[in-house]
A protein has these predicted regions:
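Sequence-level preference for short, compositionally simple segments enriched
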Residues: 49-232
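Catalytic His-Asp segment of secreted/periplasmic serine-dependent ester chemistry enzymes
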Residues: 1-46
């Protein structure tokens, strides 16, 4: 697959002589359901995904942002499930408020990474600031994430957020948040967030913000002596 080309849309359009994405999924779903029916012990391993992200071109999209953008706005009655295959996706991910009810599932080794920091300048020569430094921004309610690593690789250069969460009822399971200062920004005032079996590391007040956040069975690792949290 050529760089910057989407496998699902050769030359920018669907090929009517072959199955499109929806048709391929229907056929695959029928096949998987038939196998599960014939071999019931395999049924528990079946998981259906609406979109697949893969850097090698084997999925529907090359980047996580492309998959998020493809989700219909305000899809209220059903969840959209996205599988992220193994790889380091260097992108500044934004999940806008309209992309509700998304489940983002990572294979082992799925990483969303960027290297902005507060004192880094934008195109206008202004400092990005703490909020502008994040590798990922999540605003959409009812967002579920499993087995994804969020990291900021800028190093010990001051505030550098790995994940900025302003979403209500956000649920993170078996995720990792890697950085130094200000790793996890539980930003949203009055919103609720739940973190289960997650790993969070940093140096200076690396868990902070206004949200009501619950951390259940999480490993919180301070990379050196200092404050872990800075509640607002």
């Amino acid at each position: 697959v050529e760089p910057n080309q989407v496998p699902a849309f050769p030359k920018g359009r669907e090929d009517n002589t072959h199955l499109n994405i929806y048709g391929a999924r229907v056929i695959a779903g029928i096949t998987v359901d038939a196998i599960a029916k014939e071999v019931p012990e395999l049924a528990k391993y079946v998981r259906h995904y609406d979109f697949v992200v893969a850097q090698d071109g084997s999925g529907d999209f090359f980047t996580v942002q492309e998959a998020i953008n493809a989700v219909p706005d305000f899809r209220k009655n059903v969840r959209t499930t996205i599988l992220v295959r193994k790889g380091v996706y260097k992108e500044k991910l934004i999940v806008p408020e309209s992309k509700i009810n998304i489940s983002l599932i990572g294979q082992e080794g799925a990483v969303i990474s960027y290297d902005d920091y507060a004192n880094k300048q934008n195109v206008f020569g202004e400092n990005k600031g703490t909020s502008g430094s994040s590798s990922c921004y999540i605003y959409a309610p009812d967002f579920y994430v499993e087995n994804i690593t969020f990291e900021n690789t800028s190093g010990p250069v001051g505030q550098a957020v790995a994940c900025f969460v302003s979403a209500d009822r956000a649920y993170f399971k078996n995720c990792r948040f890697l950085g130094f200062q200000d790793t996890l920004y539980t930003y949203g005032k009055g919103v609720r967030q739940y973190y289960e079996d997650c790993y969070i590391e940093g140096t200076v007040d690396f868990i902070f913000g206004w949200s009501t956040a619950v951390f259940n069975r999480c490993h919180i690792h301070s990379k050196r002596d200092g404050y872990v949290t800075a509640p607002s």
